[in-house]
Amino acid sequence: MRHRKSGRQLNRNASHRKAMFKNMANSLFLYKTIRTTLPKAKELRRVVEPLITKAKIDSVANRRNAFSKLRDSAIVAKLFTELAPFYKDRPGGYIRILKAGFRTGDKAAMAIVQLIDLETMTDTTAGTTTS
């Protein structure tokens, strides 16, 4: 019986799941929107939201913790310098999961995962680069 076992297995072993969610989180922070299956998107929320919450407090320990999860120093720097200050007044719910129909090959439920307030984030960053 699987009482009190949280999280989805997704037909993968633990190391594969860890690597997959690391790559998906890196892609989400880099491109601000990704397309994946619905169960993976719902699990990705459990990985990404605590990272953004920790990044709001910029300390060496929090940066090392984020680096241990993401393993990419450029993405960690972007998380702490761009994304975390943008969400500093938001208490949670940093990503949006939109249902995007079904995949053609196997009819798997697809979803679009994007960072909340994406439009205003791109407008503010575009405005600062042109000024």
Swiss-Prot record:
The keyword Ribonucleoprotein applies. Pfam families: Ribosomal_L17. Transmembrane segments: none annotated. GO terms for cellular component: cytosolic large ribosomal subunit. InterPro entries: Ribosomal_bL17 (IPR000456), Ribosomal_bL17_CS (IPR047859), Ribosomal_bL17_sf (IPR036373). One of its GO terms (molecular function) is structural constituent of ribosome. PROSITE patterns: RIBOSOMAL_L17. Keywords: Ribonucleoprotein, Ribosomal protein. SUPFAM superfamilies: Prokaryotic ribosomal protein L17 (SSF64263). GO terms for biological process: translation. Part of the 50S ribosomal subunit. Contacts protein L32. Belongs to the bacterial ribosomal protein bL17 family. NCBIfam families: L17. This is Large ribosomal subunit protein bL17.
